[in-house]
Each structure stands twice: as structure tokens, then as C-alpha cells.
Amino acid sequence: MYKRQPLGRWIDYVFYVSFFPQLVAGPIVRARDFIPQMYKNPTVTRSEFGEGLFLILCGLFKKTVISDYISMNFVDRIFDAPLLYTGVENLLGVYGYALQIYCDFSGYSDMAIGIALLLGFRFNINFPSPYQSATITEFWRRWHISLSSWLKDYLYIS
């Protein structure tokens, strides 16, 4: 359904729900944002190609270098045996986990957005620096924007 009307062909629906860049880890792409792009001739400019490649590489770096490294070499060790570490080290483990989870989620989103851009589809940025927020409310608005929007629309969270 798009604009309260069924899509013209079932293959359009299948394409929308199975579009692989966003299928596994998001971002959650709404039909109102995706369907109009489906019917346009997908063109990728040199600038968009560069932007897409940059997003893929940044996302890959966040996920594999930062998130996975912090997880394996720092956070998991502290969380597996917290009594072996001091209070400060445990606190650093919590901060490390916050960085790890951000880099994991935003890394996947950046890669998906970059791949979609290489295919001629533009998705919105999903994690615009949430840890630079001044309030919890602002943090929630910046953290996984597509999920927050979906929850707001379908679970009526305001």
C-alpha cells in the first residue's frame, strides 16, 4: 500500500519489502519514501557514487574496526568478569559499550544507505551524532531515527 492505494503490481511490493540494502539492519525505509524512487529512472551521478562509496567505507570502518575491536578486546572482557576490574574500569566498559553499540548500528545503517545510493536510491541518515545531544529527548530523536519514527507512527509514542 502506498498513499492508501495498493501498488499496481505485486512485483513492486516484493521489490520494496526485499530491497536488500535495508533488509537486514535498517534503516527502516517507509513506502512513502521508497516507492516514488522506484518509479524514477535510477541514475547515479559521480558525486552520488563518491558519497555512496564513502558511506560504505565509513560504515565498514565503524562496524569492523571500532565496534568489533572494542567488543572483543575491551567490553566483553569487562562484562564477562566485572569483579576482576575496578569501578573506573567497569565505568569505562559501560562507555565502551555505548560506543560499540553506536558504531555497530550506525555502521550497518551507513553501509545500507551507501549501497542504496549506488543503486540510485536515497535514504535518510539514521544516526546524526546522537552522543552530541544536550538532552535525553534530543538523543532519542537522533538515535535510530527510522525506528523512532516507526514506533511513533505505529505505537503512538510521542
Language-model features and meaning:
Residues K3-S158:
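Membrane-embedded transmembrane alpha-helical bundles that form the catalytic cores
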